[in-house]
Amino acid sequence: MDDDGDGSSSPTDDSAAAGLLPLFSRSPAEDLEEKLRRAMEENARLTRALDAILAGHHAHQRALLAPSLSPPPPSATARAPSVSTSCAAREDAAPAVAAAAASTACPSRQQPPTAEPRPKVRTVRVRADAADATDANSMAETVKDGYQWRKYGQKVTRDNPYPRAYFRCAFAPSCPVKKKLQRCAEDRSMLVATYEGEHNHALSTQTTEFVASGCTTSQHAGGSSSSPLPCSISINSSGRTITLDLTNQAGSGSIASCGVEAAAVSGELVTVLSPELRRHLVEEVVQVLKNDAEFVEAVTNAVAARVVDQIPHIPVHL
């Protein structure tokens, strides 16, 4: 029996001797499953942590936006009428004290000072006989605009040897329009009338009939319509200067005179002219613009740019 006991061996020794794996070892597939399970648990834990962070962020955001979304307390709304009421009471009590209080207690009621508008200025040039007298009354009779004027001054300027006369509209006491009348220093036969401001009254019936009758009679007193009209035009940089010739025959001169009168009455040099004078003025303007090299160049560049813009763009493939 001893021999049998000594020669016997356990099953574990037999399996080890045979080179078999132990019973508790795992296969590679089981290792991968274990790693996947651990990764899923870590992912779930991180998801819960992220949800908690987002919940805290939303809570802080709602806490910050709550004051701006909530209505103002009743005390603040009740305080605003009291401030306006106190300002009104101060103004009723003492105007001087109210002005000082408004500058300190009510700054919102202050308004920035606005710049005063500059008076509108327009110039009319009338060609007259150079042999006429240079006194203000003669010049005023030459430039007829349909208004009544009162002379209030005269002086000689440094750049012109001829005196400049100052007139004020006498049609209405409150009319702010002023007129300056002076002979041109370069051309003695040219009278320059400068108007400042706009009339705040309407034309009288006599003045309206005077201007209308002048335009009507000029169309019939000018003789043949084929004769050249005694009108020349010159345009300055601002486009507010027109020159009319009044030195030729009476009939054609009345047409130009009518243009000056209507120009001064309208205040914008836009007149009710006869068709012949209007056509002649258009021809003069076209001639002046054609002789202006800068204007022609500007029009040429604008037309060229317009033509280039209309050409369709064709891509070039090299």
UniProtKB/Swiss-Prot annotation:
GO terms for molecular function: ATP binding; DNA-binding transcription factor activity; sequence-specific DNA binding. The keyword Transcription regulation applies. It is found in: Nucleus. PROSITE patterns: WRKY. Residues 7-19, 76-86 have a biased composition (Low complexity). Transcription repressor. Interacts specifically with the W box (5'-(T)TGAC[CT]-3'), a frequently occurring elicitor-responsive cis-acting element. Regulates, probably indirectly, the activation of defense-related genes during defense response. Negatively regulates basal innate immunity and XA21-mediated defense against X.oryzae pv. oryzae (Xoo). Belongs to the WRKY group II-a family. Interacts with XA21 in the nucleus. The WRKY domain is required to bind DNA. This is WRKY transcription factor WRKY62. It comes from Oryza sativa subsp. indica.
